[in-house]
Regions:
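Bacterial N-terminal signal peptides
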Residues: 9-17
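Acidic Gly/Asp/Thr-rich repetitive segments characteristic of extracellular carbohydrate-active
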Residues: 34-73, 77-79, 83, 111-114, ...
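Surface beta-loop-beta hairpin patches that serve as ligand-binding interfaces in beta-rich domains
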Residues: 430-520
Length: 520
């Protein structure tokens, strides 16, 4: 396909899909029933607030209908597993499961799932705290499972203590996930997946969520675990205003590892205004990075995100053997600080392709990003990294010494600023920027060198400490000092190549046509 970079249009379409796709009006009764549950209740009672039910077992016997609401008494613990099977409500009268009185009710499911929705529609789970027995102390399941459902809302949920994912959305569509705190789980905080080889998980919106301290699945000895937010075999996904931190540190194996926020075998994903920091991997393990566009990802964008102090690279660009083709993805207006010093990549950006087929790994636009690393390199190419159509424009690359590791092949670098903290410039053993540009025909437009080798006058580099996406708009550490001309020495990507930059910079200010770096 032609690379037209129409991601603003894509974003608007995805929002329409997520909030409106598949909806239909249904005529139902004007009112539903209410059911109350309290530790002081009795399952033989009426289920009213005055005479509440007591146990989850009672809830599982109810045949809920459109408009019904289930209330659990806040700050009380209810033992067991909620299972709702094949119940369909309606757009205007959803079924709601929530808390009443002060605080959130706690569902303690021990070694099993806490809440499972199977083949259901129009159900909302709001203001509930779910806990398992712990990823190493008895639990072997996911926390909340949305299985083959549509039009589901998960809002204001705290989920912890599950060996697999805190929240698992499987083969479902039109799911709104908001304000979920997923922590102290095994495989992942939040996991979204369709069936293998299918994209039958679709129109998922993850907003204002956090995935923290999900260390790894002790039972998974063959693949990665300890992810923050992960999406695969899916399409039309938005992950925004969310955070992943301190995940992956107890993955029980070496080999491919976890990442803070990432997707694989996915089409039309937008990851934006997110923070991924201090994520880890096992000793000797791979990955442990901030963000990742992995095998089989297509038509996807990462924008306005901050990655810092991850053991793995801030941005992984990966294709693995056996995945669908990887193509037409964009990484723009992001910042990586001090990433990749522990994992084998040793760089802020890591590019890898185990398929060794350039036709399977092509067309990436990487522009207006800042990669700052006082410890290791800016970009690393694995010895297996064959690809085509990768273009890097208007970025600022700052590294400890070596700026580039490995061989970039036929990648295009144009309009970037390069700076080595130790040697001013070092790429492929060449210590002179102009000599490197002429040797490899890089950073040239119409035979003229358009790249730069200037120390960027950042405001407060190397000191990121923001932890909330709401703080990103005022994060000025990598905004070039006021009135510095370097900020406007990039290329006009629209005039030259027809690339629309989306109109916004990292900090949501207007992105100038010739802007260099991420913040303005």
């Amino acid at each position: 396909m032609q690379f037209k970079n129409v991601f603003i249009v894509l974003y608007l379409l995805l929002v329409v899909f997520i909030y409106g796709c598949g909806q239909k009006n249904t005529t139902i009764a004007l009112t539903g029933k209410t059911y109350y549950f309290s530790n002081s209740g009795n399952d033989s009672g009426a289920g009213t607030q005055a005479l509440p039910f007591k146990t989850i077992n009672k809830l599982n016997t109810l045949r809920l209908a459109a408009g019904d609401t289930v209330y659990f008494n806040g700050d009380q613990t209810f033992n067991g597993s909620v299972f709702i099977d094949s119940i369909n409500a309606a757009e205007t009268r959803p079924i709601v499961i929530t808390s009443y009185n002060n605080g959130s009710a706690i569902i303690n499911s021990g070694d099993s799932n806490a809440i499972t929705l199977y083949k259901c529609s129009y159900i909302k789970i709001v203001n509930i705290h779910v806990v398992g027995a712990g990823r190493k102390t008895g639990n072997i399941k996911d926390g909340i499972v949305i299985n083959t459902c549509n039009n589901i809302t998960i809002d204001s949920i705290d989920v912890s203590g599950f060996q697999k994912a805190g929240l698992f959305v499987y083969a479902s569509g039109i799911v709104e996930i908001n304000n979920v705190k997923a922590h102290d789980n095994g495989f992942a905080g939040i996991s979204v997946s369709g069936d293998y080889g299918k994209y039958n998980c679709y129109n998922i919106h993850i907003n204002n969520c956090s995935a923290e301290n999900n260390p790894g699945d002790p039972a998974n000895l063959t693949n990665h675990s300890g992810n923050g937010i992960i999406a695969g075999y899916c399409k039309n996904i938005i992950i925004e205003n969310s955070t992943a931190t301190n995940n992956g540190w107890d993955m029980p194996r070496t080999g491919n590892g976890p990442v803070g926020i990432w997707c694989y075998e996915a089409d039309s994903v937008i990851i934006q205004r997110c923070i991924s920091y201090a994520n880890k991997t096992s000793a000797g393990g791979g990955d442990g990075g901030g963000f990742d566009l992995d095998g089989g990802v297509t038509n996807t964008v990462i924008q306005y995100c901050l990655s810092y102090q991850n053991q793995g690279s801030g941005f992984g660009i990966f294709q693995y053997a056996g995945a669908g083709n990887w193509h037409d993805n964009v990484v723009r207006f992001n910042i990586s600080e001090e990433d990749g010093a522990v994992s084998p990549a040793k760089a802020g950006i890591f590019i890898w392709n185990s398929s060794r087929d350039t036709n399977q790994f092509k067309n990436c636009l990487f522009y207006n990003n800042v990669i700052y690393n006082s410890q290791v390199a800016a970009i690393s190419y694995d010895k297996e990294s064959e690809h085509t159509g990768f273009k890097f424009y208007n970025n600022i690359f700052t590294a400890n010494n070596e700026l580039l590791k490995g061989k970039p092949g036929k990648d295009v670098f144009m309009g970037n600023d390069w700076y080595s903290l130790q040697t001013t410039f070092n790429a492929d053993g060449i210590l002179n920027f102009n000599a490197w540009a002429n040797t490899y025909n890089q950073e040239k437009l119409n035979s003229k060198i358009v790249g730069l080798n200037v120390k960027p006058p950042f405001n407060n580099e190397g000191n990121a400490n923001v932890t909330l996406p709401s703080q990103l708009n005022t994060f000025t550490n990598y905004q070039l000092l006021l009135n510095d001309s370097l900020a406007y020495k990039g290329l006009d990507l629209y005039m030259l190549f027809g690339i629309k930059n989306g109109g916004k910079a990292f900090n949501q200010n207007q992105a100038p046509p010739k802007g260099l770096g991420a913040c303005f």
